[in-house]
């Protein structure tokens, strides 16, 4: 499973993993055995701990009653919650590698492609290559500009800002792109201050394989474990000390291997009734 596969990466940062579930101990033992889980899985059949963390899923009914909203807490050695990562919809969840990237932005993500374009170098990476429906994945575009060259940040007036535009396939949804804080550049020639990026900077955008939005075609695609492409473009206008070059666009592409959900249940004798 995703969390087990990321266990070593967390431990290299000095973090230990534990999971908690409303399932009884026999169910968790069966699950851990089938998936070779090597971190503690804690049974909370009355959802007392789940309620204490205020993550009880109010929409869960029947045999799922008592279930927690899926997500992550980063808790320090004193028991203080330092960070938490939960999606608005209980069907969606961040992947473990996604959370590592949010906790430790300096960690290298898996590089997808490197593109040499007019006045910039673009490196594409992603938090995960293999996901299941409901996963939230971070796509990253690292931009490297030559010396004395800048591009304009979103929000600039009168110039073409840098903009990452994604065309997500059916069944996927994207959140707004996240840009770094710009620096303010004073343009002596026109006596004007403008927000810009120079040197190297990173743009991030999360995409979600949304279970609730899967149509018949997308559901069939994702259920077979095929590769899904996310394409788009990086639009920008590069300028140096004397010239603003014509607006340009670079195509971008990431690929995800979407595996079907594991719907196998524990033996009937220990299942939720």
Predicted regions and their residues:
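Short, charged, surface-exposed secondary-structure boundary motifs
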Residues: 49-54
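Solvent-exposed coil/turn segments that connect beta secondary-structure elements
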Residues: 23, 45-47, 78, 169, ...
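Thiol-/selenol-based redox modules, centered on thioredoxin-like
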Residues: 64-124
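Structural microenvironment flanking redox-active thiols in thiol-disulfide oxidoreductases
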Residues: 1-40, 45-48
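Structural micro-motif
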Residues: 36-40, 55-61, 65-73
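Extracellular/lumen-exposed scaffold segments
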Residues: 100-273
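Short, acidic, Ser/Thr-enriched surface-loop or helix-capping motifs
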Residues: 44, 75-76, 241
